[in-house]
Amino acid sequence: DANNNFKDFFYKRLIFPISNIQGKVVGFGGRVLNNSNPKYINSPESDYFKKRDMLYNLNLAKDSARQKKNLLICEGYMDVISLFQNNIKSVVAPLGTAFTEEQLKLSWRYTDRPTIMFDGDEAGRRASFKAALMCLPFLIPNKTIQFVTLPNNTDPDSYLENKKFNDLLILLKNPTKLLDFIFYTSSNQISLQDADQKISYDKYLDDLIETIRDKKTQYFYKREFKSLFFKKLRGTNSKTIAAIPKKISSLK
């Protein structure tokens, strides 16, 4: 520190061993025990430990993920541990970072449609939306992602602490597909009351569609996005999705 005193790298933090896919410990994560920041820190990166290439608990979740054809991606280590203890075995988490291209492609090795369920606070919802947009360029036929959006200011661990396991199972059985998640989350941020707003949002959708590299996937996403948009303009879009956030202060 400033006084040339040595201090443990994980001082006053709860330590989580992080294993590679073979089950060998290659690093550690540390979570604060109070409200200070950063909430999580990890071991320095090395040839054996690259955060963006790994998913916490994948070594224990992979067999269940293949069997159940689903992989649940949560936000934090405690969420993974709580769900695993409650017999939801195919659960992993990014290593305290944003969900990455490498983690998406890694999850696709075990299921064609992994599920993201981040926390229900504003930060978690922003992270979910950011993950959704990140996935678009890499979509190909039969490879996608889906979302479970938790109610305000909840996380999987708090659900289980409050004995709401059955409520959580209902949410997990009714995920939102990627296209719907992006459309309803983004369109809920604007009013679409005048022509300029409508033109701006239409252009926003066009820009999103252009990021999809696979042409067949791009074609069908464009068709579905435009269909949802025109239904919303006509006021005939009666579809509702439970717990999709109505407003996020910033999606950037």
Task: Tell what function each PLM region has.
Residues 20-21, 62-70, 98-114, 120-252:
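A charged alpha-helical hairpin associated with nucleic-acid processing machineries
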Residues 1-110, 127-128:
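Phosphate-handling DNA/RNA-contact segment within nucleic-acid enzymes
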